[in-house]
């Protein structure tokens, strides 16, 4: 199983983020995934860094993969996104992954005036985005006419230096169609985990992943205090809790069920000691 650190780009400086991500990579994590919002969900007044700028910074300052879980399609024109993704592919020597979806917080759209809140329109737009990305990355001259995007004799250079992995999250029928057509990784919403076997057949060849909140009890730690603090901060839904032995068992079961990657969202905001011990115990054992 691969392990990625999910680290929302808030509550800490960019320099601190780089330190924690590199600690995670040194401990065995494969890389980092950021979020993409115009205001932090349920914490709108908190400061937050831009998703693509933060990915560029971490790509330069750390050695693992960098990506997002996931970019919101409505925030960027696909021609802009195509250029950004290729630039990051070259800058990171192939360590950038393009995670993208049609938006998990629809209230952002009218607040910032970025697009329709209607699900059908958002999925249609995302479909066109993938088609435009593929066309522009080919290096050919592109003319494209869709409902949401129009290009006339457009061309971009350079193209990708490496294959840019595509990560798509979701479980709806049209989202799964996009996963089967375009994705390398399919991130299954944890509330749909009980439908995994049924849905996996519709995801094509995309490799399945899962995001989980994790509360890690280190050796010698106060279990009741650590878990109690986490449950006061966060929901118990989709929340793995325990010491190294318990979490090894938990993720081994996920692995046996067919999950190939976990995005670990630590409840202590990526405390370096937690990252190091989790890597040395849980990740090392499962590998």
Q: Residue locations for each model-derived region?
A:
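Active-site-adjacent structural elements that line small-molecule/cofactor binding pockets in enzymes
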Residues: 1-287
């Amino acid at each position: 199983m691969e392990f990625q650190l999910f680290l929302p780009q808030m509550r800490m400086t960019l320099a601190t983020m780089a330190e924690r991500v590199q600690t995670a990579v040194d401990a065995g994590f494969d890389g980092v995934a950021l979020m993409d919002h115009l205001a932090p969900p349920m914490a709108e007044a908190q400061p937050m860094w831009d998703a693509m700028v933060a990915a560029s910074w971490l790509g330069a300052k750390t050695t693992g993969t960098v990506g997002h879980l996931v970019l919101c399609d409505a925030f960027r024109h696909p021609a802009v996104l195509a250029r950004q993704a290729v630039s990051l592919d070259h800058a990171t020597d192939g360590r950038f992954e393009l995670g993208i979806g049609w938006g998990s917080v629809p209230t952002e759209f009218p607040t910032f005036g970025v697009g329709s809140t209607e699900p059908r329109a958002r999925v249609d737009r995302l479909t066109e985005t993938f088609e435009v990305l593929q066309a522009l990355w080919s290096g050919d001259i592109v003319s494209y006419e869709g409902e949401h995007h129009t290009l006339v004799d457009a061309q971009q250079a350079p193209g990708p230096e490496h294959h840019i992995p595509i990560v798509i999250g979701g479980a709806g029928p049209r989202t799964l169609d996009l996963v089967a057509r375009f994705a390398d990784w399919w991130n299954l919403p944890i509330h749909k985990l009980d439908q995994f076997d049924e849905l996996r057949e519709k995801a094509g060849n995309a490799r399945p992943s899962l995001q989980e909140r994790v509360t890690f009890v280190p050796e010698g730690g106060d279990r009741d205090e650590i878990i109690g603090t986490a449950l006061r901060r966060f929901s118990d839904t989709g929340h793995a809790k325990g010491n190294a032995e318990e979490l090894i068992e938990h993720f081994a079961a996920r692995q046996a069920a067919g999950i190939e990657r976990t995005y670990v969202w630590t409840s202590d905001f990526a405390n370096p000691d937690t990252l190091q011990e989790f890597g040395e115990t849980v990740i090392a054992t499962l590998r």
